[in-house]
Design a protein with these regions (language model features):
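Bacterial Sec-dependent N-terminal signal peptides
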Residues: 6-26, 90, 95-97, 101-105
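N-terminal low-structure segments adjacent to metalloprotease catalytic domains
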Residues: 11-14, 102-199, 411-473
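Solvent-exposed, low-complexity, repeat-rich "mucin-like" stalks and linkers
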Residues: 12-15, 22-49
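Surface-exposed binding patches on compact interaction domains or structured appendages
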Residues: 17-20, 41-69
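A short beta-strand micro-motif common to beta-rich folds, especially ectodomain repeats
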Residues: 78-90
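Active-site-proximal segment of zinc-dependent metalloprotease catalytic domains
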Residues: 107-122, 129-133, 153-325
């Protein structure tokens, strides 16, 4: 900034007199600045008045040219402060405005923090970050923190995550967007039956809702999400992750199934009220659950969406159990669910919540102990329909979170989640150990979930299928 020159001059008795300030008359300081100066040019007497305890001139009177030093105390408060000093002489006076900013209480772009640390050795890591939050939202305890806290509590407010919370470490990563919200390719919100115009918003991770009508599909800049997750030292292990333009794996740590990124769940909270959500999953285990902050209630709320996308798809590696089509699931289908696709993903440890055959021997291994203990788990069996088809595919219970977002993981789903938690933690999972901490739904709760499913048949909007990268077909 150029200095603001304020100058007075006159002649008296044949003598020229002058007085002026040749430095800036507005001084702006950061919270930790400790000095400033006022540059006086004069051949007359002058005086400085108006100082405060935190802003004191080194001299208050003088004559002639002088650079008056201002001693500034650091501002340890969050609020800014200001003072006006006046430099006066017989020729006139000049006000000097001094403003000092408060301590910055916001998080820096790209900063991270450990929000919850439960284990020092072999923790199960969750990284939560937000898109569509501006600088004003990144204040400590502000909208960004509140959204991350809400996501974290929603994730753990369901079994079995609730019982095994002490196995998890949770991190927040802070990202600043120019705009709030997300880009609307097609603005239909199934929860409100409203259609919004195409809107492009400048956000950190470019969260975008589908261009397809009536779709809840969501996408983002997956490369940048992984880059930000790896700002955390505990996650930044191995070579930099490089994805292809379409989001599939090119190289780096994500290629190694044993790398920590493939044992870490990433949740992207999108600062938009639309009901939508999608999980992108990689065959090596990495996953990003994209969850807008839906203002819908019940099974289409933000919390319900997050548990389905992040807890069910992202961590559990489950597929969808809802039904769109009245016929049988095809053997092959390049654009949708098929028997071949499900079986191949099951070979990689995914989609274990569905069975492509109605036989105990052919069902996923996580179902076996439940089928062997029908007296203890009478709710578990073969229930036809799932993966969008009514026939030729079976789920383990009448209803679960992977159907219509009810707050319930069924028995085999809980067992698979338990197995994954224990394995990541370096502990051996066993059926006996699982049974000691399993929180089984009561018959009345199960009846309520079934009733909820029937009630939702007309009004519930199922979330779109997950994005499966590097599909094995």
């Amino acid at each position: 900034m150029l200095p603001m020159l304020v100058f007075f001059a006159c002649s008296k008795g044949g003598k020229d007199m002058h007085f002026g300030i040749i430095s800036d008359t507005t001084i702006r300081l950061s919270a930790d600045d400790t000095q400033a100066e006022i540059d006086i040019e004069a051949n007359v007497d002058w005086a400085v008045t108006g100082g405060k305890d935190w802003c004191k001139p080194d001299v208050v009177r003088g004559s002639g040219d002088r650079k008056v030093k201002l001693t500034i105390k650091p501002n340890t408060t969050s609020g800014s402060r200001d003072v006006t000093l006046t430099v006066g002489s017989v020729l006139g006076s000049v006000d000097i405005y001094v403003e000092q900013a408060g301590v910055t209480t916001g998080y820096a772009e790209g900063a991270y923090k450990a929000a919850e640390t439960n284990r020092q050795t072999n923790p199960v890591n969750i990284v939560i970050m937000g898109d569509g939050f501006t600088a004003a939202d990144l204040e400590q305890g502000g909208a960004y923190d509140q959204a991350m806290d809400r996501a974290r509590e929603a994730f753990f407010d369901i079994e079995p995550f609730k019982s095994y919370r002490n196995y998890f470490n949770v991190y927040y990563v802070y990202a600043e967007s120019e705009d709030r919200g997300a880009t609307y390719g097609w603005g239909y919100d199934g929860s409100t039956k409203l259609t919004f115009a195409f809107t492009e918003r400048n956000t950190a991770f470019k969260a975008t809702f589908s261009t397809s009508a009536n779709s809840t599909a969501t996408s983002c800049n997956y490369q940048k999400v992984f880059d930000y997750a790896r700002k955390i030292p505990a996650i930044k292990v191995g070579a930099d992750i490089v994805l292809k333009p379409d989001g599939n794996i090119q190289s780096g740590a994500i290629s190694d199934v044993n790398n920590v990124i493939n044992k870490t769940l990433i949740i992207l909270v999108i600062n938009d009220t639309r009901y939508a959500g999608t999980c992108v999953m990689y065959p090596t285990g990495a996953a990003i659950g994209m969850c807008p902050m839906s203002t819908a209630v019940g099974n289409m709320s933000f919390e319900a969406t997050l548990r389905h996308e992040a807890g069910g798809h992202g961590f559990g590696k489950f597929t969808d159990e809802y039904i769109y089509y009245p016929g049988a699931i095809p053997q092959t289908d390049a654009s949708g669910y098929s028997v071949n696709e499900i079986q191949q993903w099951q070979g990689l440890g995914f989609y274990k919540n569905m069975s492509t055959v109605k036989t105990k021997a052919g069902a996923p291994e996580e179902w076996q102990p439940f089928l062997d203990n029908a007296a203890i788990y009478p709710e578990v069996g073969f229930f036809e329909g799932g993966c969008t088809y009514a026939l030729g595919i079976w789920r383990a219970e009448s209803n679960s979170i992977m159907n219509d977002n009810v707050p319930y993981f069924n028995g085999p789903q809980r067992y698979f989640i338990y197995n994954r938690i224990k394995t990541i933690a370096g502990e051996a999972p066993t059926w006996a150990d699982f049974r000691t901490r399993d929180v089984q739904a009561t018959p009345s709760q199960l009846n309520a979930f079934t009733a909820m499913a029937r009630a939702n048949e007309s009004g519930f909007i199922p979330l779109g299928r997950p994005i499966m990268m590097d599909m094995p077909l």
